[in-house]
Amino acid sequence: MKRVVSIKRRIYWTKEFDSSHFLELEYESKCRRLHGHTYRVEVEIEGEPNEHGMIFDFNHLSELIKTLDHKVIVSEKWVRYEEGYVLIEKNDKLLKLPRSEVVVIDKPNVTAEYIAEWISERILENAGENVREIRVRVWEDPRSYAEITLTLKPQGS
């Protein structure tokens, strides 16, 4: 490897999951109504192998996406809690769902952009000092996705 100037190591992982959501919009749109998608999430993580020889454990990614699968994803702005239920008030509607069927995200809306951001933040919580970059892409359909990239401080900075 005499001629090698640098090495970049990156892992890639992808998974589909089914979830429903609705959007807060100031204009009339079908997306204001509860609807679902078969999302596809793609994750790329750049870094160096840790003491176990991994940049990041794929099992953490699988468990994270399992929490979203077949759930209703809502913004924390729209909810209140009542005896094991989540009450969701939005767009002149009130939904009462068991807590186990809802994922409440700490974002102002439930767009693909904010879902990607939420996923990237959960990955960051489990990332070691060996991770340099986290990229998350969330596809709502075969034609459209949102992507976020987190560039992390180098070790010891």
UniProtKB/Swiss-Prot annotation:
According to UniProt, the reaction catalysed is: 7,8-dihydroneopterin 3'-triphosphate + H2O = 6-carboxy-5,6,7,8-tetrahydropterin + triphosphate + acetaldehyde + 2 H(+)
Q: Which UniProt keywords apply?
A: Lyase, Metal-binding, Zinc
Task: Show the GO MF annotations.
Answer: 6-carboxytetrahydropterin synthase activity; metal ion binding
**Where exactly are the transmembrane stretches of this chain?**
none
- Cross-referenced Pfam families, in alphabetical order? PTPS
Functional description taken from the UniProt entry = Catalyzes the conversion of 7,8-dihydroneopterin triphosphate (H2NTP) to 6-carboxy-5,6,7,8-tetrahydropterin (CPH4) and acetaldehyde.
What does the record's miscellaneous section state? The active site is at the interface between 2 subunits. The proton acceptor Cys is on one subunit, and the charge relay system is on the other subunit.
The protein, known as: Putative 6-carboxy-5,6,7,8-tetrahydropterin synthase
In which organism is this protein found? Pyrococcus abyssi (strain GE5 / Orsay)
Gene label: queD
